[in-house]
Regions:
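ABC transporter nucleotide-binding domains
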Residues: 1-149
Length: 149
């Protein structure tokens, strides 16, 4: 294991639009060592949130990673399957978002995010997980229909 906690190499992200693609982040590279404090600073629209979403693989469509490597604790995140990265994210990565509106995964429903926590951290699956999700949603007065969107 190296002393690098995070290594981003030549990361590029594009938004694929009907009229073509638009580069959001182009060939960004940096590394963070274990115990190092790091800040990602830039103007609004400069790609900070896009970089963070890319490194934890939560980019909402139409954004796609078109190039690069994201290595966290010697694991190439971009080479993992969707299920593998989901488990890795839950066990190895913590992020504090600047805004509460960005705290949830933008590409998953609230229902599925709650279910993931139950499955990964409490080993509750299937019908038991579905019932627990409904119970938790009722506690905060969110309908299951709203939690699916």
């Amino acid at each position: 294991m190296t002393d690098q906690a995070l290594k981003i190499k030549n990361l590029s992200v594009e938004y694929i639009l009907k009229k073509g693609s638009k580069a959001a982040v182009k060939d960004i590279s940096f590394q963070i060592k274990q115990g190092e404090i790091f800040g990602l600073v830039g103007e609004s629209g400069s790609g900070k949130s896009t970089v963070v979403q890319a490194l934890i693989r939560t980019l909402p469509p139409p954004a796609v990673i078109t190039n690069g490597q994201v290595i966290i604790n010697d694991v190439d995140i971009l080479s993992l399957s969707a299920d593998e990265v989901k488990k890795y994210r839950w066990k190895q990565i913590s992020i504090v978002m600047q805004s509460a509106l960005n705290a949830l995964n933008p590409v998953m429903s609230v229902e599925n995010q709650i279910k993931d926590v139950l499955e990964i951290h409490q080993n509750i699956t299937g019908l038991d997980a579905n019932n627990k999700v409904e119970e938790l949603l009722e506690l905060v007065d969110v309908s299951k229909e709203n939690a699916k969107s």
